[in-house]
């Protein structure tokens, strides 16, 4: 995996501008919300973020993938202000689960999600190296 960072661009914080990968198995993980076994354990943005990311990592493990194999995360957030207010707690949860691996990321503000209690939904793409 090679991080793509054009020299004239400012270095991003908390994500990568691009990633190039050779070989491996590409894994696509559908949008995950912050529930566990179909039950909502958290109502706040940061709590739901933590669980959604944990769900992604649990699904990725089925392909023998690890956090560092994730190349893209797309977040769909219902409340931009809640997202911004939760950045510190989200960052702490992110580092706990992902370490210092920062894939490409996009955050999209949406008017609603199908699961009405969901504050966000995250989908992921990973490339698991051939063994």
Outline where the language-model segments fall.
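N-terminal presequence-like segments and the immediate start of the first folded domain
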Residues: 1-71, 77-131
């Amino acid at each position: 995996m090679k991080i793509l960072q054009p020299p004239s661009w400012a270095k991003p914080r908390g994500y990568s501008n691009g990633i190039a990968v050779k070989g491996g198995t590409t894994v696509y993980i559908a949008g995950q919300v912050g529930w566990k076994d179909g039950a909502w354990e958290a109502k706040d943005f940061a709590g739901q973020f933590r669980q959604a990311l944990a769900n992604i990592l649990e699904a990725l493990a089925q392909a023998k993938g690890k956090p560092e194999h994730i190349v893209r995360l797309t977040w769909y957030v219902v409340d931009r202000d809640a997202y911004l207010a939760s950045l510190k707690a989200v960052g702490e949860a992110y580092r706990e689960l992902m370490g210092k691996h920062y894939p490409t990321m996009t955050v999209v503000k949406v008017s609603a999600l199908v699961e009405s209690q969901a504050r966000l939904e995250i989908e992921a793409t990973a490339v698991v190296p051939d063994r």
